[in-house]
Amino acid sequence: MEALEEKEAQVAAWLKKIFGDHPIPQYEVNAWTTEILYNLSERNRIRDRDVYLVTEDLKQKAKEYESEAKHLQDLLMESVNFSPASLSSTGSRYLNALVDSAVVLETKDTSLASFIPAVNDLTSDLFRTKSKNEEIKLELAKLEKNLTATLVLEKCLQEDLKKAELHLCTERARVDSRLQNMDFLKAKSEEFRSGIRTAEEQLSARGMDASLSHQSLVALSEKLAELKRQTMPLKKKLESYLDLMPNPSLAQVKIEEAKRELDTIEAELTKRVNMMEL
């Protein structure tokens, strides 16, 4: 319990330090929120400590560099009676450029022995960067080519899709039309069947022979077709008899009798078919 109260006090102090004169946002104070804010305050404290140490180290190095620079200036004055302040504007620019180059190249001093390796390393980095750029350019060219092909393919697919949709609409309209025609034909067929049944009932009521009904006439028509099929061999056989020379008169009589019998059958069936159509 004491540990929790200590953490709450530390969190409150940290929030007051963070927000300063601004009001601290309201939040629910419980063990969970206190633990989270306590961990944040600890991380913030550690970060501030690290920043402080780095800052102090940089300040110390700056003092050391200033001391070293003053020592070198004094050494120059004592040895050759030279001071950077005595340089011309051009000399000052050259000196500043030399110093800036040393800083950029991260050399330990401005001697030629330090500059040459640094420049060589920079040149190597430049070549590696150029090589990498060339690889990236080639990769980009491949990607652009693939992208172009993909776009062309996408356009073709879109056109094919439009054609397919148009064809589908046309086929759908055709199917709908056929369905409507089929429904119409079914209705008409049912109407005709009903009319035939009604007519047959009326004719039957009037004493019509059942053999003249629609079904009977259809059966007779089928029977006529079967008789015609069966008489075909007889006709062929009869034709072969016509070529025979003995007793032509008797043969002619038989032929005429067969023709009359066949004509009678065909006439009777034709009459019944015509009555069916009426």
Swiss-Prot record:
InterPro entries: HAUS1 (IPR026243). One of its GO terms (biological process) is centrosome cycle. The keyword Nucleotide-binding does not apply. Its main location: cytoplasm. One of its GO terms (cellular component) is HAUS complex. Component of the HAUS augmin-like complex. The complex interacts with the gamma-tubulin ring complex and this interaction is required for spindle assembly. Associates with microtubules. The interaction with microtubules is strong during mitosis, while it is weak or absent during interphase. It is unclear whether this interaction is direct or indirect. Interacts with EML3 (phosphorylated form). This is HAUS augmin-like complex subunit 1. The gene is HAUS1.
